[in-house]
Amino acid sequence: IKMIIEFAKEKNIAIMADEVYQDNIYIKQDFVSFAKVLNNLEINDVTLFSYHSVSKGYLGECGHRSGYVEYRNIPDDVINQLLKMQAVGLCSNHPGQIVIYLLVNPPKEGDESFPLFIEERDGILSSLKKKAKILSNGLNSIEGITCNPIIGAMYAFPNITIPQGKNDFDYCMKLLVETGICIVPGSGFGQKEGTHHFRTTILPPEEKLREVVEKIKVFHGNYGN
């Protein structure tokens, strides 16, 4: 993060920090925001946009289409343009505003709902952590697939070895047709030339994830034959 901030300062470019997975950490490591590092470095001339959303994290309320952006060190003319963009909306997203309020103002210790909030939040994060291990271990058990440990967020990005002349888009499409499993080709994420990957998620239930791994195992063994 420090290197990115220093690079942005040198090149006079803004930083757009997508920090929606700050609660989804499955190892003993604290989340560190760009804003915190920026403050620690006492740098006040690097523009920073920090994003959060109710669609991600442990809430996963995608349908509400609600989030927020915190900005720092923004020139006045940019603020004016942002206000113009905000003003063109015909009406406010009332349900989304309610949900984003709950995100930034969760129950506090002493509140009647606090114990239930902690129980539900920790239960969701514990389940995601378990499913992250199920998926990464399962994919690594398949010959020709290697997957880094999933230490945060909700996704895996395994490397796949496929026959010469094949590509990850073809792999993903055939997997969808033959098994009903939908994954995303790694070529859409700027993967290194000459390598092949796909992206998938840890969101399905635990037993469903095990079933997904078994289907991918059979498919991968037969792919290209």
Name each model feature, range by range.
Residues 1-225:
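PLP-dependent class I/II
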